[in-house]
């Protein structure tokens, strides 16, 4: 029983330490694979959102947005784009964070989507053991 109590205490301490406020800075690479068709003049848009994981019916808040204009890629060659998303915001306790990544045209239509390590799902970052550096791989939204 004493061992169980110590384990719970350590788990609570670790969770509290992980949620201490820090810098909400996310860095990484957006990879456009060889198979993606030629693109030119598009915009790469990355957004960092903050949400309360305990409130299901509340929308996430936009913390930072980065737009890289005139993105270009040639089919048959992998293209890498480095990014840094926000340096001035702080991580808030008991909040979670995720990023979105899209390639959009001049009218705002989304063509490509970035996924963490090429895996579908929410790209969580910064808290709960999630990284502050990510590798996003673009894919066609229609596939």
Where do the PLM segments sit?
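A short, amphipathic beta-strand motif
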Residues: 24-33
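A short, solvent-exposed beta-strand micro-motif common in secreted/extracellular proteins
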Residues: 92-106
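A short beta-turn/strand-edge loop motif at beta-sheet boundaries
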Residues: 34-41, 55-56, 90-93
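A beta-strand/beta-hairpin structural motif
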Residues: 64-88
């Amino acid at each position: 029983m004493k061992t169980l109590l110590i384990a719970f205490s350590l788990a609570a301490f670790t969770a509290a330490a992980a949620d201490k406020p820090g810098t909400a800075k996310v860095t990484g690479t957006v990879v456009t694979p060889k198979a993606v068709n030629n693109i030119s003049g598009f915009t790469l848009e990355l957004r960092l959102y903050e949400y309360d994981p305990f409130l299901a019916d509340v929308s996430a808040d936009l913390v930072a947005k980065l737009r890289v204009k005139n993105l270009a890629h040639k089919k048959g060659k992998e293209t890498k784009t480095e990014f840094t998303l926000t340096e001035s915001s702080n991580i808030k306790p008991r909040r979670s964070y995720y990023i979105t990544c899209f390639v959009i045209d001049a009218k705002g239509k989304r063509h490509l989507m970035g996924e963490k390590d090429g895996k579908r799902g929410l790209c969580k970052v910064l808290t709960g053991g999630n990284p502050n550096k990510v590798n996003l791989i673009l894919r066609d939204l229609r596939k």
